[in-house]
Structures are given as structure tokens and as C-alpha cells.
Regions:
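Conserved beta-strand and immediately adjacent loop positions that scaffold enzyme active sites
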Residues: 8, 102, 119, 152, ...
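Cys-nucleophile CN-hydrolase/nitrilase-fold catalytic domain and related Cys-dependent amidase chemistry
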Residues: 21, 33-125, 194-196, 200-210
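N-terminal phosphate-binding loop and adjacent alpha-helix
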Residues: 13-30
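Cysteine/selenocysteine-centered motifs that mediate thiol-based redox chemistry or coordinate metal-sulfur cofactors
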Residues: 155-183, 276-318
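CN hydrolase (nitrilase-like) catalytic-core segments centered on the catalytic cysteine
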Residues: 81-102, 162, 171-267
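Conserved hydrophobic/aromatic positions in well-ordered beta-strands
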Residues: 10, 121-123, 246, 267
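Extreme N-terminal starter segment of soluble prokaryotic enzymes
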Residues: 4-11
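Active-site catalytic loop in hydrolytic enzyme cores
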Residues: 82, 86-88, 92, 108-186, ...
Length: 318
């Protein structure tokens, strides 16, 4: 469905109730109510908002046995079945508010416990529209999350337009982006944990490359958000995720809202989806400016199995 109208969107930068999925979902419902009151039809919430992102500031400790079993158990207990009752709560909020939402969760499989997934959900008044599992957990995330399969790389048709996107550093994967671009996203959701300047530059590039409005939303995680009985020792710092929510338009990659740092908050912007059509008149990465006929044949055959990170070179003792 190609929608050519103005859609009001909300980038909701928020702090989860860490290791409490039920309380985090209740908070998400309140935040969606705030977004609806502001007139938003679509809201985007952060990566693994329900209900813990394994930050590289402390996640390395999970490679030891000190506290790691307890953390893993509590993460699993505070993760989300998809579909499941917590998803149903969010869908009920979408239905009552007449909204769509993209939200990041830690997904579990209750019937087959043992692996969690970094998952992105598309929800709306009609229910669970789609889910995508992160293809490649980043560095420290591999202590917690399994890898995705890739058959869920899609843009979803809604009455807010076609909504595509990827999770955090998946957005750095050119072929993953291209796979979604081919489905014509008009709005690109990028839940993330990256609060760097380089990330925002990348979001601007994706807006230009895709011809879509980009909504990127990290968490804001102050030290005070962690429960007193958090199983791992936290390093001495006050903030573990500084935010940086941003909305970017598709013609020249201009930032139209944000970036928002150092606090919880919400960015609201009216996205004129006709701008994506105008942008693609000049550059359509998967249409008139694509040369699949030339470039696809230059790609080597993909390996049958995912590549592992090579081990470090062994140093012989002197």
C-alpha cells in the first residue's frame, strides 16, 4: 500500500523498568497514550525496550560465572512470548488508541527455553503485524541473543504507509538494507542502543538511500534505573545509554526532530510521505538507479553457513 499523505509520528525515548516486563509494558501503554494525545498515528520505541538491553558497559561480566546464571534466568523471565499476553496488552492499546507501534523486545520461546532473540515487533489495531529477529547480535549481545534467519526482512503495509526497518547495527549491513528497500518502505524504524554521532550520520545516509523517513530511537538508561539487586556489578558511571532519538527526512537527509540526549522524551513530527516519492524521482536505489543486472553477478556465492569471527592469532611464548 502506497500512502501519499502526511503521517504524524512519535519517537519515544524511554527507560524500561529493568527486568520487569509487565511493568515495562504498562509504561509503554502510558507512553503510547501520550503519543496518541499528541496526535501521532505511529510510534517507535527503543531496541529491547522490554525490558533490558545488555550494554557493553557491563555485559562482558556475563562471560564469567559470577552472577551470569541469575541474570540469564531473570532476563528470560522478563522476556516476551510472541505472540503472548504482553503483546496482547500492547495490541489492545493500539486498538483503543487507533495507533501503530514498532517496539523492541527480548523474545523468548516458552516451549523451547534456552535462547533469547533481539526482536522488533510491528503492532497495530489489527494485531501483531510482523516480527523480525535481529540477524546478527553485535559483539557483547552474542552472550545473550541468538541469530535471526533473515526470512523476516520485510516492510509492512499499514494505513500509515509501508513501514520497514532494522535493529541497531543491522542497519550497517548493506544487503539487509537492500532486501528491505526492495519492498518500498516509506518510513524506516531503527530501534537502537547506539548513541554516537556516527550513528546519526548513518541514519541520515539511510534516509537518502532508502527514500524513507527514518525514526531512530535509543533508550535512555541512567544508573538509577537498575534495580538494587541487579546480578552484575555496574561500573562507576551515571549513564549507560544517553539517548539520541532523531527523525530524518528523505530528500536530503536533513534532521527534522532531535537529536534528544540525556533524558526521556518524545519527538513528534509530521511526515509528508510525498517527499519520499519526490526523492525517488532523483534516486531510487532499487528502481531506476539500480543495476542489479550488473552488480548482482559480481557478488560471490554466499557460504552455506554464517561466518564465525576468526579466533585471534596464537602467540607462542618467548
Amino acid at each position: 500500500m502506497t500512502v501519499l499523505r502526511t503521517v504524524r509520528v512519535a519517537a519515544i525515548q524511554a527507560t524500561p523498568v529493568i527486568l520487569d516486563a509487565e511493568a515495562t509494558v504498562r509504561k509503554a501503554v502510558r507512553l503510547l497514550g501520550d503519543a496518541a494525545q499528541a496526535g501521532a498515528e505511529l510510534a517507535v520505541l527503543p531496541e529491547t525496550f522490554v525490558s533490558l538491553y545488555p550494554s557493553n558497559a557491563w555485559a562482558h561480566q556475563a562471560a564469567t560465572f559470577s552472577g551470569s546464571d541469575e541474570l540469564w534466568e531473570r532476563m528470560w523471565l522478563s522476556s516476551v512470548d510472541v505472540p503472548g499476553p504482553l503483546v496482547d496488552e500492547l495490541v489492545a492499546a493500539c486498538r483503543s488508541l487507533g495507533m501503530h507501534v514498532v517496539v523492541g523486545v527480548n523474545e523468548r520461546e516458552s516451549e523451547r527455553p534456552g535462547t533469547l532473540y533481539n526482536t522488533m515487533l510491528w503492532l497495530g489495531p489489527d494485531g501483531l503485524l510482523h516480527k523480525h529477529r535481529k540477524l546478527m547480535p553485535t559483539q557483547h549481545e552474542r552472550l545473550f541473543h541468538g541469530i535471526g534467519r533473515g526470512d523476516d526482512l520485510r516492510a509492512v503495509s499499514t494505513d500509515c504507509g509501508r513501514i520497514g526497518g532494522l535493529i541497531c547495527w543491522e542497519n550497517r549491513m548493506p544487503l539487509a538494507r537492500y532486501a528491505v528497500y526492495r519492498q518500498g518502505p516509506q518510513i524506516w524504524a531503527a530501534p537502537t542502543a547506539d548513541d554516537s554521532d556516527g550513528w546519526i550520520a548513518h541514519m541520515r545516509a539511510i534516509a537518502i538511500e532508502s527514500g524513507a523517513f527514518v525514526i531512530s530511537v535509543p533508550q535512555y538508561i541512567p544508573r538509577t534505573a537498575f534495580p538494587a539487586d541487579f546480578p552484575l556489578a555496574l561500573p562507576e558511571r551515571d549513564v549507560f545509554g544517553n539517548g539520541g532519538a532523531v527523525i530524518v527526512e528523505p530528500t536530503w537527509g536533513q534532521i527534522v526532530a532531535g537529536p534528544l540526549y540525556g533524558e526521556e522524551g518524545m519527538l513528534v513530527y509530521d511526515c509528508d510521505l510525498r517527499l519520499g516519492l519526490h526523492a525517488k524521482r532523483l534516486f531510487d536505489a532499487v528502481g531506476h538507479y539500480s543495476r542489479d543486472d550488473v552488480l548482482a553477478g559480481l557478488l560471490p556465492a554466499a557460504p552455506a553457513e554464517p561466518r564465525d569471527t576468526p579466533p585471534p592469532a596464537r602467540t607462542e611464548p618467548a
